[in-house]
A protein has these predicted regions:
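Non-catalytic terminal segments and appended small domains
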Residues: 1-60, 93-155
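A structural signal for short beta-strand/turn segments enriched in small hydrophobics and glycine
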Residues: 61-76, 117
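Small beta-strand-rich domains/subdomains or short beta-sheet motifs embedded
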Residues: 22, 56, 63, 74, ...
């Protein structure tokens, strides 16, 4: 484990949780930026869905509530509805993902970000999110449950 990330290895995969961000149970991350928040998908989420091939965003300027859809993502494995970890107004979307959706897989905590939101009541929104350490523990439980389920299916 290094200073910037928490990491765990499952099978041959390394799952990373970046420190200094907030996380939602729906496997999105939130980064504070000058009163706005940048939202992206976690490493766990992108590994679970596989290679991302397409993403569709809402219009800039719309208001979103917590748990309301902010993107539709298509991967080689599934179609996923991505929901907002907080409430606010979408002020920007990552247009670069239209041409290179695979950036979500390649750089989930960097160039693979999804949307920029001007949050309503930032403090209240942040109180509903998890710290990196708490999300890391939740992710490990999810991974353990998936491994148990996989073991049952393979018997």
């Amino acid at each position: 484990m290094n200073e910037e990330h928490y990491q765990t290895v499952v099978d041959k995969f390394i799952f990373t949780v970046k420190r200094g961000l907030f996380y939602a149970e729906n496997d999105t991350w939130v980064k504070l930026e000058n009163g706005r928040v940048r939202v992206g998908l976690t490493d766990y989420f992108q590994r679970r869905v596989g290679d991302v091939v397409y993403i569709e965003f809402p219009k800039v300027g719309i208001d979103v509530n917590r748990s309301e859809e902010i993107a539709q993502l298509e991967s080689i494995k599934t179609l996923s509805s991505i929901t907002s970890p907080l409430e606010g107004t979408i002020v920007d979307v990552n247009q670069a993902l239209n041409d290179k959706p695979e950036m979500i897989n390649e750089e989930p905590f960097g160039k693979g970000w999804l949307v920029l939101i001007h949050p309503l009541n930032l403090k209240n929104n942040l109180n509903q999110l998890l710290t990196a350490k708490r999300y890391f523990e939740l992710m490990k439980v999810k991974l353990e449950n998936e491994m148990k389920q996989s073991d049952k299916e393979n018997k």
